[in-house]
């Protein structure tokens, strides 16, 4: 589902499905209260060893039991 999918005309079933997916994705992140603390700790460790402040987290894939997060680190030359 991309950002542009929200602006297309589609049926009510497809709209309801998209809304449900967004709600479920949000609820999954709410069920993991340690996730934000873990991100802060990862940033602290990366900054300690690389002196980089350009760190980005991306959630790639989520299902009922696994959430995959990608960390992008821009290293200075």
Swiss-Prot record:
- Alphabetical list of InterPro entries matching this protein: MinE, MinE_sf
Specify the domain of life of the species encoding this protein.
Bacteria
For the biological process aspect of GO, one term held by this record is:
regulation of division septum assembly
What Pfam families does the annotation carry? MinE (PF03776)
Q: Which keywords belong to this entry?
A: Cell cycle, Cell division
Stored NCBIfam families: minE, PRK00296.1
Q: Which family does it belong to?
A: Belongs to the MinE family.
Per its database record, what is this protein's job?
Prevents the cell division inhibition by proteins MinC and MinD at internal division sites while permitting inhibition at polar sites. This ensures cell division at the proper site by restricting the formation of a division septum at the midpoint of the long axis of the cell.
From the Swiss-Prot or TrEMBL record, give the protein name.
Cell division topological specificity factor
């Amino acid at each position: 589902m991309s950002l542009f999918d929200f602006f297309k005309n589609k049926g009510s079933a497809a709209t309801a499905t998209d809304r449900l997916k967004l709600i479920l994705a949000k609820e999954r992140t709410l069920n993991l209260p340690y996730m934000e603390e873990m991100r802060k700790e990862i940033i602290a460790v990366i900054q300690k060893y690389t002196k980089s402040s350009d760190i980005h987290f991306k959630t790639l894939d989520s299902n009922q039991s696994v959430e995959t997060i990608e960390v992008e680190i821009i290293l200075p030359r």
